[in-house]
A protein has these predicted regions:
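Extended substrate-binding grooves/exosites of carbohydrate-active enzymes
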Residues: 1-115, 121-128, 132-142
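Short S/T/G/P-enriched beta-strand
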Residues: 72-92, 148-175
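A short, polar/proline- and glycine-enriched secondary-structure boundary/capping micro-motif
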Residues: 115-117, 157-158
């Protein structure tokens, strides 16, 4: 028969649920990808769901790395979301990993080292400071890194029309 998780379950809840049932041969997660329609809980001007672990453009969202760190033997070490804020902002970043231990550094200065337990993600809240935010992880004696860098000022943007509008109602395409 069907065994289901309640609607709105967290990735952590889902992973634990699966792990406790070794007799399962697989699972299905609704939804893996964002899709057009069902804009709940947002309605006005939204055109797609935001529940997937991969967005509508095919880019991985943070929960993707949580699941990946659970189901793969390969190393997963992902620092999210980005490092472009205002100086002094309080920012929470997440590290999704299957490393045994991680160290967070800001501009080369150690912020904190943590042991990572199964099913956990590491959350850090710190004051934004422009530069490089880096996480160093260790697994089986090997060291891995991921980093986020503050971007500089945009100097220019170039847009090129590759398919012009030929009749009313058409869509122009740019790159």
């Amino acid at each position: 028969g069907n065994v289901t998780m309640p609607w709105g379950s967290t990735p952590k809840g889902w992973v634990k649920f699966m792990e406790e049932r070794p007799y399962f041969s697989g699972s299905f997660m609704w939804t893996g990808f964002d899709y057009h329609g069902e804009t709940n809980p947002f309605y006005h001007s939204n055109v797609s769901s935001s529940f997937g672990t991969i967005d509508i453009c095919g880019m991985e969202k943070p929960p993707f790395y949580y699941y990946k760190s659970w189901w793969t033997d390969g190393v997963v070490l992902k620092l999210t979301p980005h490092w472009n804020f205002r100086k002094g902002d309080k920012v929470t970043v997440a590290v999704f990993t299957n490393c045994e231990e991680i160290t967070l550094l800001l501009n080369g200065k150690k912020i904190e080292t943590r042991k990572i337990e199964k099913y956990d993600q590491a959350l850090f809240t710190l004051d934004f400071e422009p530069g490089v935010l880096e996480v160093v992880g260790t697994k089986n004696g090997n060291t891995y890194t991921d980093k986020l860098e503050t971007s500089g000022k945009t100097s220019s943007v170039t847009v090129t029309e590759i398919e012009p509008i030929t009749k009313s109602g058409d869509i122009a395409i740019y790159e």
